[in-house]
């Protein structure tokens, strides 16, 4: 039986174009080595299109039975099956060569090849991504995307305990470093033998291009500095974003802000995120135009969006880089006490920007979301951050992806919403259920709006209401609210430019 599983994995590699006929025996022997099997007989017959997840599970179960896994749990299974996938992988240099050959024909052909490879290699686990729950909700700002992320596996208690005991290794320095390519992983760091990177030169420095293993949206890519330098928003950031867009005009690219609370989860390594997807924010129109002295040729305006976003457009990206630097410098030093905007308190800076670049037709576009990370006694997690009334759905930072209109909600919500829907249909008291109690005030608020609620439509209603909460979260993160007062304070800043 195990011979059949091994042959199926090699057949999968052939079908995916990872392994050619010439590589078949080599790949088989590599798998035998990883499986610690010395005897092999080619099976008579195997399926034409073996399923990868099923085949790996057969191999993993066998390895676990024979004591090759420290524990038979997801962390150790992932470390082991990545070692198996490595047996099918082309060398990093071959991948880069193929990418460059295709790029000479068209950038999109090159990214198509690389994206497919990143999935075929199981670096992106398609069968896990398929578990993510996604929907979209209409709002005053356009259709907002919501997702409950289930593709990051929950660690089991044994792995968590082992990770605590494991000595802290400084290699690779972090999950983004180029040293991850081919790294075997450990209990507190994923295996990356099946991971490949394309080197790029942007702003005359060496950067790497890869896909995110968790694919929050189509062709979700990460562009990262080959040096482990911290995140920084500055003129060079805008240069690098546009250098990337000139290389891959079919992609957008953006950067997280460089301050805690309003930044992303990794501030220690300079990186950007991009992809082949049109977010609600990119579709949102300019609601009010402005002319900025010295930049009369640049189309400038405030975007109709819950966060405070300035959009600038021009056919020459150098004009946008100059203006973006001007806006960034003005915003970093800007205080307006009436609007509760403070550039700094006690020497700690608060103002920064989340920038997003794209090309529309022959015009370059740069969206600058104004961010401020001030905290107060009433809002210890941040004034322009999800407020406490929404924490039952989302309390994490609002980073780049959320700024653009895609909610990435915690996995716990899947079970909580299912439980909640049962309670609502049966008319039970939500407050009486320990893990649902946190949702009770929210339920009290929206239930009166839905007399039509029944077992057929309850989940749709919950999804719609979660969407409204996320819009509220984005409004919380906006420095200038979408009210007459907020918009006139925003205009006041625009006039200072």
Report each predicted region and the residues it spans.
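Catalytic or ion-translocation cores adjacent to nucleophile or general acid/base/metal-coordination motifs
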Residues: 236, 245-265, 274-326, 332-335
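Hydrophobic faces of well-ordered beta-strands that scaffold small-molecule active sites
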Residues: 209, 253, 270-272
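Active-site microenvironments that recognize anionic phosphate/pyrophosphate groups
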Residues: 1-223, 227-230, 304-306, 320-324, ...
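Histidine-centered divalent-metal-coordination microenvironment in nucleic-acid enzymes
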Residues: 218-225, 263-279, 367
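Helical scaffold of the NTase/Pol beta-like nucleotidyltransferase catalytic core
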Residues: 194-196, 228-253
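Beta-rich nucleic-acid/ligand-interaction surfaces
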Residues: 260-268, 346-352
């Amino acid at each position: 039986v195990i011979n059949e599983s091994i042959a199926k994995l090699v057949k999968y590699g052939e079908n995916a174009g990872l392994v050619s006929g010439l590589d078949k025996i080599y790949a088989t022997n590599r798998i035998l080595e990883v499986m610690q099997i010395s005897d092999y007989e080619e099976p008579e017959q195997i399926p034409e299109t073996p399923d990868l997840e099923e085949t790996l599970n057969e191999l993993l179960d066998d390895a676990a039975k024979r004591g090759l896994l420290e524990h038979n749990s997801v962390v150790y299974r992932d470390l082991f099956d990545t070692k198996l996938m490595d047996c099918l992988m082309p060398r990093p240099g071959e991948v880069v060569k193929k990418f460059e050959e295709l790029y000479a024909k068209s950038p999109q052909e090159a990214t198509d090849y690389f994206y497919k490879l990143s999935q075929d290699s199981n670096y992106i686990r398609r069968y896990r991504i398929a578990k993510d729950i996604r929907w979209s909700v209409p709002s005053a700002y356009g259709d907002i995307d919501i997702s409950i992320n289930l593709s990051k596996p929950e660690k089991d208690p044994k792995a968590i305990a082992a990770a605590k005991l494991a000595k802290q290794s400084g290699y690779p320095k972090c999950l983004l470093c180029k040293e991850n390519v081919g790294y075997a992983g450990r209990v507190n760091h994923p295996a990356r033998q099946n991971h490949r990177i394309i080197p790029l030169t942007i702003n005359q420095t060496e950067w790497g291009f890869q896909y995110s293993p968790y694919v929050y949206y189509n062709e979700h890519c990460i562009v990262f500095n080959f040096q482990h330098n911290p995140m920084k928003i500055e003129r060079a950031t805008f240069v690098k974003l546009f250098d990337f867009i000139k290389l891959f005009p079919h992609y957008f690219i953006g950067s997280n802000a460089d301050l805690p609370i309003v930044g992303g989860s990794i501030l220690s390594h300079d990186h950007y995120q991009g992809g082949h997807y049109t977010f609600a924010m990119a579709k949102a129109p300019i609601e009010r135009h402005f002319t900025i002295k010295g930049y009369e040729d640049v189309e400038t305006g405030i975007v109709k969006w819950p966060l405070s976003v300035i959009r600038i457009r021009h056919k020459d990206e150098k004009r946008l880089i100059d203006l973006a630097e001007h806006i960034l410098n003005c915003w970093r030093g800007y205080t307006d006490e009436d609007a509760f905007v403070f550039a700094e308190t006690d020497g700690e800076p608060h103002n920064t920007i989340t920038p997003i670049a794209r090309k529309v037709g022959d015009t370059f576009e740069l969206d600058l979301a104004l961010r401020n990370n001030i905290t107060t006694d009433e809002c210890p997690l941040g004034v322009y951050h999800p407020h406490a009334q929404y924490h039952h759905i989302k309390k994490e930072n609002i980073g780049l992806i959320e700024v653009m209109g895609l909610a990435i909600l915690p996995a716990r919500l899947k079970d909580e919403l299912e439980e909640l829907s049962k309670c609502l249909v049966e008319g039970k008291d939500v407050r009486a259920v320990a893990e649902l109690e946190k949702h009770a005030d929210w339920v009290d608020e929206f239930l009166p709006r839905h007399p039509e609620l029944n077992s057929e439509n309850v989940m749709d209603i919950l999804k719609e209401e979660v969407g409204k909460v996320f819009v509220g979260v984005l409004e919380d993160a906006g420095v200038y609210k979408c009210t007459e007062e907020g918009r006139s304070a925003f205009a006041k800043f625009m006039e200072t430019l």
